[in-house]
């Protein structure tokens, strides 16, 4: 019995000893199966790994150990074909020599090859790959056999390469650490008509924009020398989005060589943009003629006139910014032909047209209102001798020649009056208008006029809001000093039409 018991213990010990390694292996298998690399990985969001990246650098992945997932603009999978040297921001790029597994295949071993010295697989290393739910792959990396080697990502697998749709002259490429539309390098053209400039005729500036890619196809480099008729307006090329470059010039006569032409309906600015590859010009340069036509209105006519008789006033409104008002004398009811020069000379019985415009400020909210407009025989706006044309926002109803076309309803005000002169030794007339910026949201801007209202209300002028124009004289008058408007010793022997009426009404107003 003792011998049998000893034999049984020995057998049991042997069985236990043999069973222990098997049980340990089962435990390891259970731990391995419980670890899913699809849920335990490190993200590599490095667009510079893209196979399209040609930036020179010597980045090395010798420190990459573990499971990784590639994401971002550089691509989400390793390339399966040989990658040219010096791509992926390294010397010898690593690519996957084999296909990616499917979900059913689980974890597979693949060979990663490094391209160097003309050999697509000069160095090798084993990489484990697994396909994961959600259509992505994870890779178990074990560093690199040498430096500088780096694991690449296939640019064609990038989820969001170029956000904008590239034009035919562009290609979606990875450059400077990002995907974008860049000019194609294979563009080549000798047809200058293929260059289609864009012209923007603005109120304050004229802008000519050119397609940088089309310029490249015509042989122009990155640095283009551009200048207008006036050489002082050179080196004004500005880079814009989507591979466009532009040149701007002020919307002014003679600025940057602008040539101004006017017909009965439009003001036309003409200029020429010249392009060259170098500052020292030996080859034929490219000339681009352009012009902008602006329909004539009060504002444009003042901008295009060389020496208009005009007055300007800047007004600051609390919380609303700064406003600019201009007032000028015009020759007819179209208000597009301002008087120019040192003085306005009118024929007997002719009409004088006065226009004012709110040029700068919130014209969608504020209307221009002429509160008081009056004439004086001197340029002094406080001269006690005044003849009111507009009083308390309403026209002088005792003067039938006064016609207010617009006042308080928009950013413009216009009125006309038949020319007159003051009795006595005065040769000149000066006009003065007190303005008000009327808030159309909170005020009644359009005047409501009556004859009794004009008589009863007293005029309280604000000199800080008064615009001054002049001098004005009649065509047949003797030569006068137009600088200060002082009385002339000669005076007038002949009275103008409407002379006596303003004198009598001056006592009433």
Swiss-Prot record:
Renumbered residue ranges of the record's region External hydrophobic patch (EHP): 463-471
Highest taxon, organism lineage: Eukaryota
Name this polypeptide is given: Pancreatic secretory granule membrane major glycoprotein GP2
Glycan-modified residues: 40, 97, 109, 176, 188, 232, 263, 314
Lipidation, GPI-anchor amidated aspartate type: 484
Subunit (UniProt): Interacts with SYCN. Interacts with bacterial adhesin fimH.
Disulfide-bonded cysteines: 38-132, 60-147, 82-120, 88-152, 113-121, 162-172, 166-181, 183-213, 201-292, 233-256, 373-433, 394-449, 438-445
Cellular localization per UniProt: Zymogen granule membrane; Secreted; Cell membrane; Apical cell membrane
Annotated segments matching region ZP-N: 200-293
Gene, per the UniProt record: GP2
Residue numbers spanned by region Internal hydrophobic patch (IHP): 318-329
All residue ranges annotated as the EGF-like domain in the record: 158-202
Propeptide part(s) removed at maturation, as residue ranges: 485-509
Region listing for Flexible ZP-N/ZP-C linker, in residue ranges: 294-317
Location of the region described as D10C in the Swiss-Prot/TrEMBL record: 36-56
Key words of the record: Cell membrane, Cytoplasmic vesicle, Disulfide bond, EGF-like domain, Endosome, Glycoprotein, GPI-anchor, Immunity, Innate immunity, Lipoprotein, Membrane, Receptor, Secreted, Signal
Tissues of expression: Expressed in pancreas.
Sequence segments annotated as region (ZP-C): 318-456
